[in-house]
Amino acid sequence: MHINTPVLLAIIYFLVFAPKSADAWWLLSKTDTSSANSGSSPILCKNVPGLTPQQKRMCHENPNIIKYLISGLRSALHTCEYTFQREAWNCTLTLPGVGTSPLQIASRESAYVYAISAAGVSHSLARACSKGLIDDCGCGETPQGSGSVAVSQASSRSSSDFVWAGCSDNVKFGNTFGRKFVDQYDRQHATEPRSQMNLHNNRVGRRLLVNAMNKECKCHGVSGSCVTKTCWKVMPKFDEFASRLHQKYQLAKLVTNNDQKLTVRSSPSAGSSGRSERFARNMDASSKQMRNELIYLDASPNYCAIDVKDRECGENCPNICCGRGWRTTREIVDEPCHCQFVWCCEVKCKTCKKLVERNYCL
């Protein structure tokens, strides 16, 4: 299935919405970053309407950091579209024929987009830091007090012995800079229910990224032996993280505004169990139990009102096509086959023809 570019999605979105909003910074996703580096300081944000003075200042003072922030935003939108490609809402930012967008509605879809965008920015900045691409940051912090120490004699050590070393992804920097930039508008309107929702979901995205970090290790020794093992912390691939966040989307909690405080309502969430709903009933959205849960204020729009004609629906046609039926086509495609490893270091493949079936909504 062809995936539309996230840049195009963002452009379409901002043709629909007034940029004077919490979403104005998304306009950066269509900004040309090719000349942004530590040696030159083009004002990447000068033509982006709706940014706060603080965002404009950060953009002017940190062009190289903003370049990777933009890259993270683009990655988030692209990954969102890929994750939802087989669902009724495929992460499109406009609803043809409806005259609105999911992001104008404080829905579970909006909750996911905010969370994935905040995490995408942090992911991109954290990885750029660990690669030495940003002068203002370096490797992430090394965990302390692990109690696992490598020993000199391989025969007397267990496979779990290691020392923290190497270069961890700097998620702390990514989250800190991302929060200061992305959350700027909503922090200034923190008494408004929609801004409270946005800030909560941004925090969830960043917190889940930290929680998803894994230990990666490398052995050191003669002839492949593991006399010493060093380990560091790395983030998961972003598409893997997006899949985990999708589970949170399915279990997102409906909240209501109660005297400028968001409270979880006892309304069923997609894929949730009655037990989990009873547990969350009448719970403050800022409570400890809700720290890792997405929240939303409004029901989702009717995605069956969208013109889905000719949309590829895969194995989920009854849901995506909304009962309008679908057609199946058979196509011959080229794909690599009979691949062989050629020393050193190349993989050579032949090209084979394959008959595939594709389903499209009527």
Swiss-Prot record:
GO molecular function: cytokine activity; frizzled binding; receptor tyrosine kinase binding
UniProt keyword list: Developmental protein, Disulfide bond, Extracellular matrix, Glycoprotein, Lipoprotein, Secreted, Signal, Wnt signaling pathway
Origin: domain of life: Eukaryota
Consequences of knocking out this gene: Embryonic lethal with severely defective embryonic morphogenesis with the formation of unspecified differentiated tissues, no endoderm and excess mesoderm. In addition, embryos have defective mitotic spindle orientation in the 8-cell stage ABar blastomere.
Post-translation changes: Palmitoleoylation is required for efficient binding to frizzled receptors. Depalmitoleoylation leads to Wnt signaling pathway inhibition.
Free-text tissue specificity from the UniProt record: Expressed by anchor cell and vulva precursor cell descendants P5.ppa, P5.ppp, P7.paa and P7.pap. Expressed in the tail and weakly expressed in the vulva and body wall muscles.
Residues covered by region (Disordered): 263-282
Keyword Metal-binding: no
Similarity comment: Belongs to the Wnt family.
Protein name: Protein mom-2
UniProt source species: Caenorhabditis elegans
